[in-house]
């Protein structure tokens, strides 16, 4: 064919290829890319195949499907809250307590009393449950004569108690007690006539010791109780230590020996202890008795029966001078106040009259200085019940409270729960405890009552309880 390039035709023929006519021969297929790269023409004419579909979901994969946290934890929280509420509601309630709201002490107005103390020796005055009213002189051990018999009687009654109205055990009189009656009369001792083989009641033997101050009977009781006077004296000193009588030494049961020494302060301690025994107090206050022989024996303490004096014991000797351990009881609006005092070493003649007169002057001035004050009035709020969970219920005095004291004295107030404890619930006006003013036997106690209804703690209080 004229004009056709002979080179191209020769190449086709030499390769042995034949060209088939194509209806779309207007489009020429592009050669494959080299080196695995796709050209722009490839991208335009032959787009890449779609990605393969994901593999089917397995059961393990399904377990890892995310879960809503609210759905997981809400039931747990609700369960814990329910358990908490149940536990709080069922926990044992704390024991209710009484709390005092008025002042815990009361001070009497006025000045401390100025008392007529003796010009010699030593003296001490105390009010039972209130404390020391005053003291005079150096508290050093001095002979106390027959005041020692207070300890003798106290030890006998401690070792061999007597019921009120009874006479106690039987004490057989020995030969020594009979002989000491005769020798005692010769030497000017206080003695009572007895005969060996006689039987004295324990009560009558103590009467002989406390009223006519019989030395021979004091020694008889010592031998009867302990087997010997020396053994009994050891008991006396042991009891003295128990009572805190550290400046006291007993060397005989009668007090005749000047080596039996004590102080006014120590004897007042013994007086307080001894007067707690009703039989001792009865003996100490007797003015006379009739003995086994029909003789009337007098108490040498002439103060008994006047000026509220109820005891206790005299003692006199040349070495000791005049000595007296005394007690008085005065009634203040229905409350009995015991006052115990001791005066030692009064040597002005007549020594017994001197100590009795000076003691009476001192005692009566002391009793005049005592007064009764209204500390709390009926209906006054004195405290509250604390239920332990924040609840409070007022507590009121059911009557006036009067305390005994003297100028400047401070007495203590306390609010005490009943023995079986404070209840969790009670109606208004129910007794709920005791208000105490003072201490020991002179303390005044009145019941206190609820000012309004006492209710058990509410569910809300139980729920919010932390402790």
Segments (PLM) and residue ranges:
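Active-site-adjacent loops and short helices of periplasmic peptidoglycan-processing enzymes
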Residues: 93-265, 272-281
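Short Pro/Gly-enriched beta-strand edge/turn motifs at strand-loop
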Residues: 105-106, 304-313, 414-419
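Conserved SxxK-family serine transpeptidase/carboxypeptidase catalytic domain
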Residues: 90-93, 369-467
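Solvent-exposed coil/turn segments that connect beta secondary-structure elements
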Residues: 128-130, 159-160, 174-178, 224-226, ...
């Amino acid at each position: 064919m004229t004009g056709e390039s002979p080179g191209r035709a020769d190449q086709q023929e030499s390769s042995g290829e034949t060209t088939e006519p194509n209806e779309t021969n207007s489009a020429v297929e592009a050669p494959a890319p080299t080196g695995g790269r796709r050209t722009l023409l490839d991208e335009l004419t032959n787009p890449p195949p779609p990605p393969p579909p994901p593999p089917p979901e397995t059961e393990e994969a399904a377990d890892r499907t995310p879960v809503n946290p609210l759905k997981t934890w809400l039931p747990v929280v609700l369960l814990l809250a329910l358990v908490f509420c149940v536990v709080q509601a069922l926990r044992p309630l704390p024991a209710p307590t009484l709390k005092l709201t008025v002042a815990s002490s009361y001070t009497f107005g006025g000045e401390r009393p100025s008392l007529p103390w003796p010009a010699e020796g030593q003296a001490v005055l105390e009010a039972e449950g209130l404390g020391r009213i005053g003291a005079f002189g150096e508290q050093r051990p001095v002979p106390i004569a027959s005041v020692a018999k207070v300890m003798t009687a106290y030890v006998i009654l401690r070792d061999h108690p007597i019921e009120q109205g009874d006479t106690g055990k039987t004490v057989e009189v020995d030969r020594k007690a009979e002989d000491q009656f005769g020798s005692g009369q010769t030497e000017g001792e206080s003695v009572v006539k007895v005969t060996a083989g006689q039987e004295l009641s324990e009560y009558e033997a103590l009467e002989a010791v406390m009223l006519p101050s019989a030395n021979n009977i004091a020694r008889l009781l010592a031998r009867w109780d302990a087997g010997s006077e020396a053994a009994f004296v050891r008991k006396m000193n042991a009891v003295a230590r128990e009572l805190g009588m550290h400046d006291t030494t007993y060397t005989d049961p009668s007090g005749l020996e000047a080596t039996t020494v004590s102080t006014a302060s120590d004897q007042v301690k013994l007086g307080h202890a001894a007067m707690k025994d009703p039989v001792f107090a009865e003996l100490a206050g007797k003015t006379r008795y009739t003995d086994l022989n029909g003789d009337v024996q007098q108490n040498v303490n002439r103060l008994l029966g006047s000026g509220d004096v109820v005891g206790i014991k005299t003692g006199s000797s040349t070495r000791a001078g005049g000595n007296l351990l005394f007690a008085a009881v005065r009634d203040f609006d229905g409350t009995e106040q015991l006052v115990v005092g001791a005066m030692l070493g009064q040597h002005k003649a007549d020594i017994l009259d001197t100590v009795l007169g000076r003691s009476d002057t001192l005692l009566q001035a002391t009793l005049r200085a005592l007064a009764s004050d209204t500390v709390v009035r009926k209906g006054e709020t004195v405290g509250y019940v604390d239920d332990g969970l924040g609840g409070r219920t007022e507590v009121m005095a059911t009557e006036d409270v009067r305390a005994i004291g003297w100028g400047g004295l401070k007495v203590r107030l306390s609010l005490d729960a009943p023995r079986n404890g404070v209840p969790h619930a009670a109606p208004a006006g129910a007794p709920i405890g005791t208000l105490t003013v003072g201490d020991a036997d002179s303390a005044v106690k009145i019941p206190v009552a609820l000012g309004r209804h006492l209710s058990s703690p509410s569910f809300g209080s139980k729920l919010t309880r932390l402790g």
